[in-house]
């Protein structure tokens, strides 16, 4: 639950078994789950200690995608390659804006996003990416500058 993007195989099973053991989920289990899925689904999963299968995990937003077992690693590599192909400065700024924004009132979150947007305009990668976009060409490899 600590990952930014979660994918799984179609035979994956998820659950929070702790209450069946007489304890609460620890290490952020209750807090992360409630932020990923609705508080109601989080409570149902935690209170009942029941497992759910991959299609249900996808439906409630616990995972982003489900793949056949044989395709999972390829899908993960393709997703990682797409992220790696993006401008690192922009990816970091986007992650920061999303994570901080979730903890802020909307008006403050919009300001956080605007600052992240503005910070990207100071980079060589932004200039290269924008130039490629306007020329309708593929951007060159980003340099993290």
Please identify what each model-predicted range represents:
Residues 1-89, 123, 128-131:
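Crotonase-fold acyl-CoA enzyme core
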